[in-house]
């Protein structure tokens, strides 16, 4: 019953609410956050990539960093709005690192040097936040070096990481960043950040291991520049320190929780709330990697105890190139990934759909109103020239899509693919129209749907000529293979190392797979991953499954380095054939994994 109720709750939260902008800044009164004369409380998400993407893991991407566009920002905040969220926390401002590859866009390039293009994306985030009615918690700097942080500020002056806390020159450099941000005038709205009501609070940083004296100095500096906004202490702890609670320049205290025992989440946050009651607002800034039932008990306690807010880690959003951005959590036990609204079968292992339904249920319990369900907006079909590579920009809240084709731009339309999830594949084309007839021209459109109904149709793309047929194998089984030896393993572990590819075929030297297609093979492409540089895969073809002959394929190595996650090396092989062969054998030369195979064939 509980599971059924959560799903139904999730599916009824897709309504469109007219956002009228913000009338008030968020203020504090004792231990409460206030929006005018009403208390402001929230249950919502960390959306770390809202202003800066670390998950652009397309197979041929040199590095995973890029800036979000307006579609992505709107999709993220619309997803939060549908889930009842009233506030989100983004991640920190990125800082240039010594080993950055060329083309990585960072916010802070050096002392007092800032990347205007990156801040234009933050301008857009604030503009859309005002439109959608979502407040932002913005932390200034990271304790860690994922995106560049305190060590990079110190490195600009050739000083050790610890200098960030007490060296006058390094502190002055950081203050230049704080001043630049607070005094920046939004290029879209014309509103200075210090006057933007979409900002809930400035957070001194993320998971800072800082002295209390540093917090006092930086909090005072922020307030000297901006009397409108609250200051949140970004000190890293699960049990609040006394100095944070008693510091008058700190308005909000926060804690982060990823417990091995879910009971610790309840006991630690209750202790924190007891210590802050009557003194100042308390926000659980990050929590996660616990079962759905534990999240339910935690949120019930959070609501009952008067905690101002709770933000689960974390939410990703639709990708402008189709599908979603994906993020496996390195500290989530090789189980949890960033959540994708409204939840999909691909997240079944970590109970994604029920968890997101629960988050929405409790968020709306705070606001006291559950909106009526609404159908998703129409998706946007992306340009394509091959009917095996169809993708679209997804619709926030959509659970599935129908792809339609016609031989005329005006119809009539027939169903080419039904109930397609845009969360099944990672950084791949979403649909292959296997039933399109070679040599014919087609037009395509896509419709989104959820329990409330079906959207209007997308834009129409076409005419697109269907060429040869394409067999596509995403390696989530061996059903498409004609034959194989017994040394194969479907690998779903540590997806981050493989550009978030959730299903790969793993084996070692001498292992093989054999494909057979109902026509002459014209070309093939194999997407592989190597732990270290190694010899090329071997390829053989024939008209029968006997007497296979060696054939050649060109290798394209796309190594961008191991990065922070130990990325394996992507090597893409492409071969062509004109011999009328219909069998293709692929042999491993060494330990490696295959993520996708495409075989083009025809008459």
Where are these regions (language model features)?
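Active-site mouth of glycoside hydrolases
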Residues: 22-252, 256-264, 278-281, 287-294, ...
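Substrate-binding cleft of secreted/luminal carbohydrate-active enzymes
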Residues: 283-359, 363
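Extracellular carbohydrate-recognition regions
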Residues: 464-493
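Exposed low-complexity, polar/acidic, P/S/T/G-rich flexible segments that act as propeptides
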Residues: 524, 579-581, 588-603
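Short beta-strands within extracellular/lumenal beta-sheet-rich domains
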Residues: 497-523, 570
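Recognizes extended acidic, P/S/T-rich segments that occur
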Residues: 402-439, 451-457
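Pro/Thr/Ser/Gly-rich low-complexity, intrinsically disordered linker/stalk tracts
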Residues: 364-397, 438, 453-467
């Amino acid at each position: 019953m509980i599971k059924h109720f959560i799903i139904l709750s999730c599916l009824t939260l897709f309504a469109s609410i007219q956002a009228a902008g913000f009338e008030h800044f968020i203020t504090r009164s004792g231990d409460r956050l206030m929006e005018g004369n009403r208390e402001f409380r929230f249950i919502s998400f960390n959306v770390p990539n809202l202003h800066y993407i670390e998950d652009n893991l397309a197979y041929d991407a040199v590095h995973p960093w890029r800036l979000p566009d307006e579609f992505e920002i709107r999709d993220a905040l619309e997803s939060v709005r549908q889930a009842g969220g009233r506030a989100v926390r983004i991640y920190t401002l990125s800082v240039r690192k010594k080993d950055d590859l060329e083309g990585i866009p960072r916010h802070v390039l050096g002392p007092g040097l800032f990347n205007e293009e990156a801040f234009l994306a933050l301008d857009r985030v604030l503009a859309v936040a005002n439109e959608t009615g979502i407040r932002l918690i913005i932390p200034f700097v990271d304790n860690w070096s994922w995106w560049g942080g305190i060590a990079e500020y110190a490195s600009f002056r050739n000083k050790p990481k610890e200098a960030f806390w007490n060296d006058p020159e390094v502190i002055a450099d950081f203050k230049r960043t704080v001043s630049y941000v607070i005094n920046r005038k939004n290029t879209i709205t014309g509103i200075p950040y210090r006057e933007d009501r979409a900002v809930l609070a400035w957070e001194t940083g993320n998971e800072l291991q800082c002295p209390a004296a540093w917090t006092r100095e930086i909090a005072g500096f922020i307030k000297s520049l901006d009397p409108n906004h609250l200051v949140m202490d970004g000190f890293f702890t699960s049990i609040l320190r006394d100095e944070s609670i008693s510091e008058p320049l700190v308005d909000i205290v926060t804690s982060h929780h990823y417990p091995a025992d879910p009971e610790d989440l309840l006991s630690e946050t209750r202790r924190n709330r007891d210590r802050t009651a009557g003194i100042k607002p308390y926000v659980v800034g990050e929590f996660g990697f616990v079962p759905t039932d534990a999240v339910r008990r935690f949120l019930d306690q959070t609501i009952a105890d008067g905690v101002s807010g709770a933000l689960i880690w974390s939410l990703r959003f639709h990708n402008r190139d189709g599908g979603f951005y994906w993020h496996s959590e390195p500290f989530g036990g090789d189980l949890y990934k960033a959540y994708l609204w409204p939840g999909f079968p691909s997240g079944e292992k970590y109970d994604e759909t029920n968890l997101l339904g629960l988050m929405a249920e409790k968020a709306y319990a705070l606001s006291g109103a559950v909106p009526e369900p609404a159908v998703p907006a129409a998706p946007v079909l992306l340009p394509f020239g091959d009917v095996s590579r169809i993708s679209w920009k997804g619709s926030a809240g959509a659970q599935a899509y129908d792809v339609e084709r016609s031989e005329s731009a005006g119809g009539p339309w027939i169903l080419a693919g039904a109930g397609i999830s845009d969360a099944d594949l990672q950084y791949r084309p979403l649909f292959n129209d296997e039933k399109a007839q070679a040599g014919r021209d087609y037009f395509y459109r896509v419709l989104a749907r959820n329990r409330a109904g079906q959207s209007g149709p997308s834009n129409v793309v076409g005419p697109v000529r269907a060429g040869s047929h394409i067999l596509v194998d995403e390696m989530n089984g061996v059903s498409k293979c004609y034959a194989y030896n017994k040394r194969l393993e479907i690998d779903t572990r540590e997806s981050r190392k493989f550009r978030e590819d959730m299903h790969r075929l793993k084996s070692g030297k001498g292992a093989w797979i054999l494909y057979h297609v109902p026509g002459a093979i014209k070309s093939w492409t194999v997407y592989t991953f190597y732990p270290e540089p190694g010899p090329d895969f071997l390829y053989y073809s024939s008209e029968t499954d006997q007497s296979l002959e060696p054939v050649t394929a060109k290798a394209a190595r796309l190594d961008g380095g191991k990065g922070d996650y130990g990325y394996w090396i992507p090597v893409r092989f492409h071969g062509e054939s004109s011999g009328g062969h219909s069998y293709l054998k692929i042999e491993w030369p060494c330990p490696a994994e295959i993520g996708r195979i495409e075989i083009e064939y025809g008459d």
